[in-house]
Amino acid sequence: MARLPFNMPLLSVVIPTYNRPQFLARVLTYYAGLRFPYTIIVADSSAEPTAKANRQLANTLRHNLNLNYQYYAEDIHVADKITRALTLVSSPYVALGADDDFTVPASLKPGAEFLESHPDYAVVHGEAVYFVLRPGAYAHGAITGVGRYAQRTIEWSTGSERLIDHLTRYTTTFYSVHRTEQLRNNWQCAARLRLDYSFVELLPACLSLIQGKSKQLGGLHIVRQGHAGQTSRTKLPSVMDWIVDSAWFPQYSSIQDLLAKALTQQDGITEEQARLAVKQAFMRYLTDQVVAAEREQRGRQMMRLRLRESARRIPGLKKAWRAVRFLMPVRRNTVSLEAFLRRTSVFYGDFMPIYRAVTGVNDGG
């Protein structure tokens, strides 16, 4: 592996935040408790008095964290905010975070070292999971479930193949470890196009997969909170509302132009071939999103009906099933709340600090 210059920081984490002080306090306190070894840049565009509280929190935690708090105007576009924060990163590798999610510190160094040793890769991540809190809870409370959040390895030799594969079964690369210069340039492209929130994450991810391969390593990397509603400007419309919006096609056309240009440079193909590849990739993406939305809606309806029927027929079923399930043997890499709370789980050591930060409980008992 190539050596970095002496004293150059390996990696940094950028956390955009907006009007969610409880989440920001939760994640920064988690990092402080673990003596997080890398620079954290907080990119805050909250309204007052939330911004004041966030600044005070950052000042309080600076003795435990290498923390750089940056304030931006409340109306700044998210792509502008991330781009400006990325210009402050001095390390060769970077990962974006979110104020309501947890990046596992132990996953970052292996990701950066993998990129250092593999110049044909642009994106690295580990296992990703999500957790759900009991109804009514916001930033703290009992965790009621844990599930796997899909991440992928994409290793085709051409940017066209990688782009098509990526959008055929889209998974986010937002939280992955990236090369700083590449990610900064990719977000600058998104900022210049003034994209809406449905497109703004897609473009940097697509550019990254054109520029290099994607690798999923072992180990827990990101633990996300799943919740239906939140105080944020980034709540996304349904896929059908997004497609039929009058702004959709002009933005898609701008993205197609940019991605086609990137493909001609990366693969040495004609502009016509590149535009066809982009079109094919987005057709597959939209098909996948529409099918997934329909499947999710049907699944929710069926689940509600089944739960109601079971609850009527068998009083106490839910409580009894949880008790029995906790006693059942599971594999060491199983993704479930019951599995994660067992010391035999490969995820136990990385998950428990997050569990404590969210629930205030020291163990799963």
Annotated model-derived regions:
Residues T29-Q70:
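Acidic donor-binding segment of Leloir-type glycosyltransferases
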